Structures are given as structure tokens and as C-alpha cells.
Amino acid sequence: MMLEHVLVLSAYLFSIGIYGLITSRNMVRALMCLELILNAVNINFVTFSDFFDSRQLKGDIFSIFVIAIAAAEAAIGSAIVSSIYRNRKSTRINQSTLLNK
């Protein structure tokens, strides 16, 4: 696969993630869009690692670290969302004013 094709795919994923993060009103959807952004970054790491220096796996290893951090972020984020849903009965971002009380 050519470098430009993979970079365009990654840019599309990143753009969809940013658009979804900006326009989402649901916390679960915002977490999913954040995962899209992190996956687009991982695609770039692996692509540039393969394209520039295939003998060293620096981009691949860094991508594994980003995947581990994304998994922890998803677990903690879903726990926070479920806790907010139990207390507020809603996962809408504009209705969660936890800092006002």
C-alpha cells in the first residue's frame, strides 16, 4: 500500500474523530470518537515506522504503548460514565454539571 493512501485514511479517521468529539452530546460517543483519534495516530506511527526504517520497530512499540493507554482510558472513561449515569440518569454532556454542586 502506498504511503499517501494510508495517510489519507488516517487523516479521514482523525477528522471523523475530531468532528464527532466536537459535535457529540453523549459521553459514550465522545469516548468512541477519542478512540478513533488515537487509532488514527497509531496508523501514522506504524506507517512511518515501516516507511522510513523497517529494521527498527520504534513506531510499532510506541503504537503498542498508545493502545495500552487507550485501553486504560476507555476503561476509566466508561467507569466514570456509568457512575454519572447511575447518579444523574443521563449521559448527556451538557446535563452533567458535577462541579456546580
Swiss-Prot record:
Gene3D superfamilies: 1.10.287.3510. The chain crosses the membrane at residues 2-22, 32-52, 61-81. The keyword Isomerase does not apply. Its EC number is 7.1.1.-. It is a multi-pass membrane protein. GO terms for molecular function: oxidoreductase activity, acting on NAD(P)H, quinone or similar compound as acceptor; quinone binding. Belongs to the complex I subunit 4L family. NDH shuttles electrons from NAD(P)H:plastoquinone, via FMN and iron-sulfur (Fe-S) centers, to quinones in the photosynthetic chain and possibly in a chloroplast respiratory chain. The immediate electron acceptor for the enzyme in this species is believed to be plastoquinone. Couples the redox reaction to proton translocation, and thus conserves the redox energy in a proton gradient. This is NAD(P)H-quinone oxidoreductase subunit 4L, chloroplastic. It comes from Citrus sinensis. The gene is ndhE.
